[in-house]
Amino acid sequence: MAYKGQENLEHLNPRKVGVLITNLGTPDAPETGALRRYLREFLSDPRVVEIPRFIWFFILNLVILVIRPRKSAEAYKSVWTEEGSPLLVYSLAQGEGIRQRLQSKYGDDVVVRVAMRYGNPSIASQLQAFEDEGIRKLVVLPLYPQYSGSTNGSTFDAVAQDFMGRRLLPDLRFISHYPDYPPYIQAMAEHIRAYREKNGSADKLVFSFHGVPKRFLLKGDPYFHECHQTSQLLAKALGLSDGQWMTTFQSRFGAEEWLQPYTDATMKSLPGEGVKSVQVFCPGFSADCLETVEEIDQENREYFEEAGGESFAYISALNAEPAHLDALAQLVEDNLQGFLP
């Protein structure tokens, strides 16, 4: 294997620290071709789909990539903005907000970049940019508060894969999760409290997290437990009693059992249980995206209303709210200790 290296090391800057903020990713456009490229990269990740590669190759290329891109493109069109994909727009705004907060304290010694695990800007391209700037110390923050091998673990894989091709490795701090980080919990509580003060409360507040196959839990993935940990801390911060809130899991894919209760099934059943109004918040999504804007605010709204529900409200993600950016910047700063003078 040929390792990448540079003959001239005079450009190395021992003072500077690179901060890489990452999220899942998004297609370049809400079009079939762009969706096919994005889904191929996403669904080819063995962390995401843990079945034998030989079998999955045929399922992916002969079935999923033939059928799903067109349908997914239509869904993305419903949430696409003039600026582009909501996830990328908000992620870039988050990166800028974190940069401003850190540079106000540390100046140009901290360089912040944003990358996507799948799609653009890629993790590899941003790591290369850090290397080109002579940066030898890195902090990586995946914006998945609750750890799962399919998200946080996959992000580490991508970083490690890039490092495997290098001759000179940087110092690395990888923030693997933050499900109980007090500033994160407080930012969410303030956000929900402000929404409810303006719009009123509902019979039930539902915390909906992205689901994963149940077998991930059975094999030792802590995601299920960390989601419940976040929910419990958030409910406590809001002063909610047990009957006022619940945790559900959305976005299941395929025929196997995923973490339950399912969000869509819950929305269909709540009206029959006497719940006439519901508010949904997604603590695991740091930015609004297809899964929140289309799946929750559109699809699950329909499920609830068609089942007899009277009032459905989606409470937006924290996105680039100041309290959220303060929390993320503080989380990064906590991990800069020893990296800066």
UniProtKB/Swiss-Prot annotation:
SUPFAM superfamilies the UniProt entry points to: Chelatase
Any one Gene Ontology molecular-function term assigned to this protein's record: metal ion binding
Source organism superkingdom: Bacteria
Residue positions binding Fe cation: 210, 291
Localization, UniProt: Cytoplasm
Catalysed conversion reaction: heme b + 2 H(+) = protoporphyrin IX + Fe(2+)
Keywords: Cytoplasm, Heme biosynthesis, Iron, Lyase, Metal-binding, Porphyrin biosynthesis
Top EC class for this record: lyase
Pathway: Porphyrin-containing compound metabolism; protoheme biosynthesis; protoheme from protoporphyrin-IX: step 1/1
GO biological process: heme biosynthetic process
Gene Ontology CC terms, in alphabetical order: cytoplasm
Chief localisation class: cytoplasm
Gene3D superfamilies: 3.40.50.1400
The protein's name: Ferrochelatase
Species in which this protein is naturally found: Alcanivorax borkumensis (strain ATCC 700651 / DSM 11573 / NCIMB 13689 / SK2)
